[in-house]
């Protein structure tokens, strides 16, 4: 019998790539999305596919469907988007988690939570392992996202302990690739769009802060392996690329790869912006035998090709 997967936020950057893979594996997929940051164009190639069902739905309201598994990806994930309506952002993480966990409890569905490396705050150790408790600011301008995701993790583990809900909690690190929103303010999409348009490349701070960037195909591989793992591992589990690089180096790399004449300009660093972000993926390696395969240059090439076509 065909398995039914619910993907909240399924028209977004990560969600749409996940939907592709679930349909390829033969599952019937229900996408629930309010299209605040997602786009139907990310699913346009599947619109005639009978395995796909799309519904406009905000997970702040309960959803009554029969499903075998739930992938909870719904939430604005870039500072520009999540700071636009911070109250709605934290509600989506918390109330949305309660509604999806309630659905999982009722239908006996396995449920995946797309948590984030932001739960570690501005880390004082690097790389960050899952047992690092973080260096966080619960009242800062980023807290609507960071603290919402932390609260969602609490809810997931309490539903597991109290109600036996079968959970998977992944802490997702910086991810990039085709279908990123061109105006979402994330480092790689910003730099590529600015380079292709010949605009100045904007770096916040002096560019010495580091990130580790995982190509979207690698990330989805890790998510699928985690959901299906036969060791019943619940998480939390870091999924990301452990290769660290400075923001300035990324900007220079993209300028070179696009052949752009763009110059770098520096602006003040926003409040609570982490200086380091790098995952310890030992747990994913040991339990899932997973590690990223696509290096940054290869992934950037694919992403630049996508944005060239998008901006043409």
Regions found by a protein language model. Name each.
Residues 246-258, 299-303:
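PAPS/PAP-binding and catalytic site of the sulfotransferase fold
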Residues 104, 160, 195, 203, ...:
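Hydrophobic pocket-lining residues that define ligand/cofactor binding sites across diverse proteins
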Residues 50-52, 130-136, 164-166, 192-203, ...:
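A short C-terminal helix-loop "cap" of Rossmann-like NAD(P)-dependent dehydrogenase/epimerase domains
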Residues 124, 150, 165-166, 175-190, ...:
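Glycine/proline-rich active-site loop of Rossmann-fold NAD(P)-dependent oxidoreductases
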Residues 216, 236, 268-292, 302:
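Conserved C-terminal active-site "lid" loop/helix of NAD(P)H-dependent oxidoreductases
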Residues 38, 84, 92-95, 143, ...:
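Residue-level signal for the nucleotide or nucleotide-sugar donor/cofactor binding architecture
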Residues 1-175, 217-220, 290, 302, ...:
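N-terminal Rossmann-like NAD(P)+-binding domain of SDR-like oxidoreductases, especially those catalyzing
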């Amino acid at each position: 019998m065909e398995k039914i997967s619910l993907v909240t936020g399924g028209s977004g950057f990560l969600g749409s790539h996940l939907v592709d893979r679930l349909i390829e594996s033969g599952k019937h997929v229900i996408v629930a999305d309010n299209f605040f940051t997602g786009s139907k164009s990310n699913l346009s190639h599947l619109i005639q596919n009978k395995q796909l069902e799309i519904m406009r739905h905000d997970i702040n309201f309960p959803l009554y469907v029969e499903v075998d598994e739930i992938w909870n990806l719904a939430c604005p994930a870039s500072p520009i988007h999540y700071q636009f309506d911070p109250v709605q952002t934290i509600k989506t993480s918390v109330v949305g988690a309660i509604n999806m966990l309630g659905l999982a409890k009722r239908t006996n569905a396995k449920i995946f939570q797309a948590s984030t490396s932001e739960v570690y705050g501005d880390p004082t150790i690097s790389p960050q392992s899952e047992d690092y408790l973080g260096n966080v600011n619960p009242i800062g301008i980023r807290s609507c996202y960071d603290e919402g995701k932390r609260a969602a993790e609490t809810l997931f583990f309490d539903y597991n302990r109290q109600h036996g809900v079968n959970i998977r909690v992944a802490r997702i690190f910086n991810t990039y690739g085709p279908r990123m929103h061109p105006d979402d303010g994330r480092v790689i999409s910003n730099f590529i769009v600015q380079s292709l348009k010949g605009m100045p490349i904007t770096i916040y701070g002096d560019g010495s802060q580091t990130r580790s960037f995982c190509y979207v195909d690698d990330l989805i591989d890790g998510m699928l392996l985690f959901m299906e793992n036969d060791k019943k591992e619940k998480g939390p589990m870091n999924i990301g690329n452990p290769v660290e690089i400075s923001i300035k180096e990324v900007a220079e790399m993209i300028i070179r790869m696009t052949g752009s004449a763009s110059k770098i300009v520096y602006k003040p660093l926003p409040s609570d912006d982490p200086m380091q972000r790098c995952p310890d993926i030992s747990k994913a390696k040991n339990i899932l035998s997973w590690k990223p395969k696509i290096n940054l240059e290869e992934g950037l090439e694919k992403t630049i090709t996508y944005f060239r076509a998008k901006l043409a």
